[in-house]
């Protein structure tokens, strides 16, 4: 039992809920490899740090000798998961789903052991359900129970439409657990309802219900909302080391500890020691550097992490410009705000104006207050914020 307690404590780290812990203990007592499932709909080509919170937990199960299944929702991705949405998510085409799925496989192996990871596609069984199977599946749940779900309840209360296929989605995800005979399913806190549907469907099928483990959603770079590509507050696992380093260094000191708890593999005692040192006067920047290097070493290598640190020091602490930066050439007159947008330094001309008003736009190191004028002729280095540079020639 002591060993089980040790394993349980390790598995509980960073989790939000385990439903139920007693069931997990019973499964661990069986002393067999558990089937642990994590599903993801390939709705976008990139995996970001927010996704890795649950991937890290899957890796932990893998290291403990359990069977891990990374389920790619090539079928459910065409339906669209309504979790956490205040409007109907537009379904993707099969071509989009399959293209994104290919990049997923490459990226998850930055975290999971490819030799011990079973990748499955839920179209293998969901596409065979047919009309009769779908009706039988739908008979397991009532509309009233579906409306207990927070996002559906809010939309219903606000007279916002809920499409029938959105009610079907949790049932399809739950059926994945029946098809795989999963012992454990992982997901973010926004997936709790779907994970519990899996438990119910397994019971209806005469199987032992899976343990549902939810993990917190990682707050993005803005320090307010969950990390999301659509919000632009994310760090992709395939981003260049220098970009990853700069973005990690940009987060607030308060958010840093949340990231340490959810992303770092350091022992909790070591994280607590770092926090104590900061409280006693250690510069939080130095602790943030440790986190940035740990993440870059994980997704690239230690050499890249050290190089990114040195570049960061040269660029920001010594005021140096990077040796390499994107280069652009424009012919004829072009507005400065338009140039910044076309060079990828800002998402819009309005953002260029806002950045300039805040003192964040520079040409050759000199601040520019008005970006409504035309850009100067010749070759110049344009900078927005601390990390974005471009060498631009206006002919």
UniProtKB/Swiss-Prot annotation:
The keyword Repressor does not apply. CDD domains: S4, TyrRS_core. Its EC number is 6.1.1.1. SUPFAM superfamilies: Alpha-L RNA-binding motif, Nucleotidylyl transferase. The keyword Acetylation does not apply. ATP binds at residue 229. Keywords: Aminoacyl-tRNA synthetase, ATP-binding, Cytoplasm, Ligase, Nucleotide-binding, Protein biosynthesis, RNA-binding. SMART domains: S4. InterPro entries: aa-tRNA-synth_I_CS, aa-tRNA-synth_Ic, Rossmann-like_a/b/a_fold, S4_RNA-bd, S4_RNA-bd_sf, Tyr-tRNA-ligase, Tyr-tRNA-ligase_bac-type, Tyr-tRNA-ligase_bac_2. A motif ('KMSKS' region) lies at residues 226-230. GO terms for molecular function: ATP binding; RNA binding; tyrosine-tRNA ligase activity. GO terms for biological process: tyrosyl-tRNA aminoacylation. A motif ('HIGH' region) lies at residues 42-51. It catalyses: tRNA(Tyr) + L-tyrosine + ATP = L-tyrosyl-tRNA(Tyr) + AMP + diphosphate + H(+). Residues 334-394 form the S4 RNA-binding domain. Gene3D superfamilies: HUPs, RNA-binding S4 domain, Tyrosyl-Transfer RNA Synthetase. One of its GO terms (cellular component) is cytosol. It is found in: Cytoplasm. Belongs to the class-I aminoacyl-tRNA synthetase family. TyrS type 2 subfamily. Catalyzes the attachment of tyrosine to tRNA(Tyr) in a two-step reaction: tyrosine is first activated by ATP to form Tyr-AMP and then transferred to the acceptor end of tRNA(Tyr). Homodimer. This is Tyrosine--tRNA ligase. It comes from Haemophilus influenzae (strain 86-028NP).
């Amino acid at each position: 039992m002591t060993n089980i307690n040790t394993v349980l404590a390790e598995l509980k780290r960073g989790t939000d809920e385990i439903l139920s812990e007693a069931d997990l203990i019973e499964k661990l007592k069986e002393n067999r490899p558990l089937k642990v499932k994590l599903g993801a709909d390939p709705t976008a080509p990139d995996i970001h740090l927010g996704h890795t919170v649950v991937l890290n937990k899957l890796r932990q199960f893998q290291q403990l000798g359990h069977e891990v299944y990374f389920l790619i929702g090539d079928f459910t991705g065409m339906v669209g998961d309504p979790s956490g949405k205040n409007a109907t998510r537009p379904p993707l085409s099969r071509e989009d789903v399959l293209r994104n799925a290919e990049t997923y496989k490459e990226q998850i192996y930055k975290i999971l052991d490819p030799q011990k990871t079973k990748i499955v596609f839920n179209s293998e069984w969901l596409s065979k359900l047919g009309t009769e199977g779908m009706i039988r599946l739908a008979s397991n749940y009532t509309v009233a129970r579906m409306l207990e779900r927070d996002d559906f309840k809010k939309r219903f209360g606000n007279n916002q439409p809920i499409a029938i296929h959105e009610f079907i989605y949790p049932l399809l995800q739950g059926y994945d657990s029946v098809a795989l005979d999963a012992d454990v399913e992982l997901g973010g806190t926004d997936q709790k309802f779907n994970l519990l549907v899996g438990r119910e469907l397994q019971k209806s099928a005469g199987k032992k219900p899976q343990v549902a483990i939810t993990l917190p959603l990682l707050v993005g770079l803005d320090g307010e909302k969950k990390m999301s590509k659509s919000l632009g507050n994310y760090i992709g696992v395939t981003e260049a080391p220098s970009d990853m380093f700069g973005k990690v260094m940009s987060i607030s000191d308060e958010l840093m500890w949340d990231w340490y708890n959810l992303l770092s593999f350091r022992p909790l005692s070591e994280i607590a020691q770092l926090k104590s040192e900061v409280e006693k006067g250690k510069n939080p920047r130095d602790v943030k550097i440790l986190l940035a290097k740990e993440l870059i070493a994980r997704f690239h290598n230690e050499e890249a992490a050290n190089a990114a640190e040195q570049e960061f020091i040269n660029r920001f602490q010594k005021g140096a410009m990077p040796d390499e930066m994107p280069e652009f050439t424009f012919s004829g007159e072009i507005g400065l705000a338009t140039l910044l947008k076309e060079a990828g330094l800002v998402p819009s001309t309005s953002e260029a104006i806002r950045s300039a008003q805040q003192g964040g736009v520079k040409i050759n190191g000199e601040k520019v207050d008005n970006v409504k004028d035309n850009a100067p002729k010749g070759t110049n280095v344009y900078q927005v914020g601390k990390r974005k540079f471009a060498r631009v020639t206006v002919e």
